[in-house]
């Protein structure tokens, strides 16, 4: 009976392998490698996403040598121009003066046209055929500039008077009155300007300081008969 129990116990005993021993010791290393690779990928993405710093442009200081060279060239150019003018004959100087005057007149005309909002004058006075208000304004600006070229002549005032009279002959009495009022207004403004200029010039003349000397006092006494030289002669 005892033998049966022992045999039964022996048959029931089952040796189970240790689960811990069956675990592959290399298991999990692949997972670690995958985690590391994912970290490396994320780091690379972060590096790519970081904005690249743009270097500020370096401000270069002006080259003093270049500046001095340009100034020297300008000075030499001016000296050559002065030398050229000095070597000119009277006829050449007159021609040069007229050339510069023409340039100045063209500049004045351009300024006058810009004042009236005119961009160009086309082919000159002969090319004008004004019909609208703007066209007459443009024509008037050009004509005024042309006439003003002779303002330095002694005959210019009389010429303007005759011209205005001749033009006003074609106007009605009401229109002539408008012209008269406009000229009178201009006359008042000119009169104020001339008076102010004359007053300013007079004030400058009064500002001159005269030096006072010791002889001024002696001369003053002599006016009243106090001549010290005579007293000295009487004493002697």
Swiss-Prot record:
Keyword Cytoplasm: yes
Biased composition range(s): Basic and acidic residues: 47-58, 68-86
Keyword hit for Cytoplasm: yes
Pfam families per the UniProt record, alphabetical: eIF3_subunit (PF08597)
TM stretches of this protein: none
Protein's cellular compartments: Cytoplasm
Region named Disordered: 1-86
Domain of life: Eukaryota
Key words of the record: Coiled coil, Cytoplasm, Initiation factor, Protein biosynthesis
Gene3D superfamilies referenced in this protein's UniProt entry, alphabetically: Eukaryotic translation initiation factor 3 like domains
One term of GO molecular function: translation initiation factor activity
Compositionally skewed regions (Acidic residues) per UniProt: 28-46
Annotated PANTHER family: EUKARYOTIC TRANSLATION INITIATION FACTOR 3 SUBUNIT J
Record text on subunit structure and interactions: Component of the eukaryotic translation initiation factor 3 (eIF-3) complex. The eIF-3 complex interacts with pix.
Entry function: Component of the eukaryotic translation initiation factor 3 (eIF-3) complex, which is involved in protein synthesis of a specialized repertoire of mRNAs and, together with other initiation factors, stimulates binding of mRNA and methionyl-tRNAi to the 40S ribosome. The eIF-3 complex specifically targets and initiates translation of a subset of mRNAs involved in cell proliferation.
Sequence similarity: Belongs to the eIF-3 subunit J family.
Protein name: Eukaryotic translation initiation factor 3 subunit J
Organism of origin: Drosophila mojavensis
Gene name in the database record: eIF3j
């Amino acid at each position: 009976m005892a033998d049966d129990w022992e045999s039964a116990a022996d048959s029931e005993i089952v040796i189970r392998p240790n689960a811990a021993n069956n675990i592959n010791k290399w298991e999990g290393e692949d997972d670690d490698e995958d985690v590391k690779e994912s970290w490396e990928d994320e780091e690379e993405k972060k590096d790519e996403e970081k904005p690249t710093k743009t270097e500020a442009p370096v401000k270069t200081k002006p080259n003093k040598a270049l500046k001095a060279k340009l100034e020297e060239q300008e000075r030499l150019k001016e000296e050559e121009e002065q030398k050229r003018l000095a070597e000119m004959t009277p006829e050449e100087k007159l021609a040069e003066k007229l050339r510069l005057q023409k340039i100045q007149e063209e500049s004045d005309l351009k300024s006058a046209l810009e004042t009236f909002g005119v961009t160009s004058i086309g082919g000159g006075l002969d090319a004008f055929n004004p019909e609208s208000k703007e066209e007459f304004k443009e024509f008037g600006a050009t004509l005024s500039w042309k006439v003003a070229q002779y303002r330095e002549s002694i005959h210019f005032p009389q010429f303007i008077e005759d011209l205005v009279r001749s033009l006003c002959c074609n106007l009605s009495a009401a229109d002539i009155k408008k012209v008269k009022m406009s000229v009178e207004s201009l006359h008042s403004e000119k009169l104020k300007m001339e008076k102010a200029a004359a007053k300013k010039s007079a004030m400058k003349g009064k500002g001159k300081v005269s030096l006072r000397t010791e002889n001024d006092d002696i001369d003053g006494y002599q006016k009243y008969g106090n001549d010290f030289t005579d007293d000295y002669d009487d004493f002697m």
